[in-house]
């Protein structure tokens, strides 16, 4: 059978406990001056969530980009509302080499902006989320794809199918902890 495919592993739930431990130490020493959190709720999800609640509130500039006010976003110094996935453009790579495209299925209910669009605006180069996604796909997905005579045809096919395949997926070495 082919239960495990080690050449194209799942890229879902790629948590990094060592990175969390490093960030915890940096928060404890006051080494973090600016922190942007998005799509995470460490105060609720981590075993040491209570400690994180105390540490995060000491960060001078802490911005939470969140779809809802959860335990973590409620304590942030700045809260930027982000759209629900049904309201926004996005992409993800659930399996190495298979890049999926998410497009809005409904209009945004509130005045929200995606993390990508917020970062672009804060850096002085405001672009709509769809434009940012197209630029990323032009640079990172289209050049490495195995099909598509032109970028526009490639985008049309990807929007229609909801995914495309990269010919050179960057596959990290697998290890089991």
Question: Which ranges hold each PLM region?
Answer:
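Non-catalytic alpha/beta scaffold blocks inside enzyme catalytic domains
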Residues: 1-155
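Long, low-complexity segments enriched in small/aliphatic residues
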Residues: 139-177
